[in-house]
Amino acid sequence: MNGDLSLIENDEAPASTVGAATREAIKVGAKRAIAVNGFSRVRIADITRAAGKSPAAFYLYFDGKDALLHELLSDFESKLLEQVSAPPSPGEDIARHLANRLQAFWRIYREDWPIATAAFQMSMTDQQFARAWHTIRQKGIRAFAAMVRRAQAAGGAAGLDPELLASAVTSMIEYACYNWTAKGGDFPERLIDDKTAVDVLSHVILQAVTGKR
């Protein structure tokens, strides 16, 4: 019997430590395989090969590629909500807060860009992915709009619509992160380090929202 299958002797085994580790290995392998082949071309065999697992093990946890991507996208959303969408603390400088949240977003996107790219592409043709992607964006826009309103209370971004500004800025951030990490971006032969990326984006965003660097 396959080594992965032999670990599963009852319905509760997938929730075990071994089952959780196998599930996580498949998700990590999926990110690697999608980064190389793209979601539309990647095969289950590519994913399990990258994960060091058997195709049979894959189907113990996921019905197919779409189900796997939905779970990866849910993980991506959880990271964003926890690390990026947190509101400023009372008395926290808005510029510092924005810079810290941007640094977190860049780090998450750098690690999970295959998921974000795949989900965005699927949202063009699949209604479930379209709704999921829209929900993630709306949460991000609302969180950013709240920071814009706080900045406006301190004299920044005077007269601008907070939600439209938040939508414009988050769209710019998302595409810049995609463009700087994707193989087909503006700099395919260049590794853009964290500090350089965050410094450039922080300058642009803080100018737009607070009028200062």
Give residue ranges: language-model regions.
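An amphipathic alpha-helix signature
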Residues: 27, 99, 103, 138-149, ...
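Helix-turn-helix
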Residues: 21, 25, 33-67, 71
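N-terminal intrinsically disordered/low-complexity leader segments
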Residues: 1-21, 185, 213
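Short secondary-structure transition hinges
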Residues: 111-143, 163-164, 191
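Short hydrophobic clusters on alpha-helical segments that form packing/core surfaces
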Residues: 22, 26-34, 76, 80, ...
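Hydrophobic/aromatic-rich alpha-helical bundle segments in the mid-to-C-terminal region
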Residues: 130, 152-202, 212-213
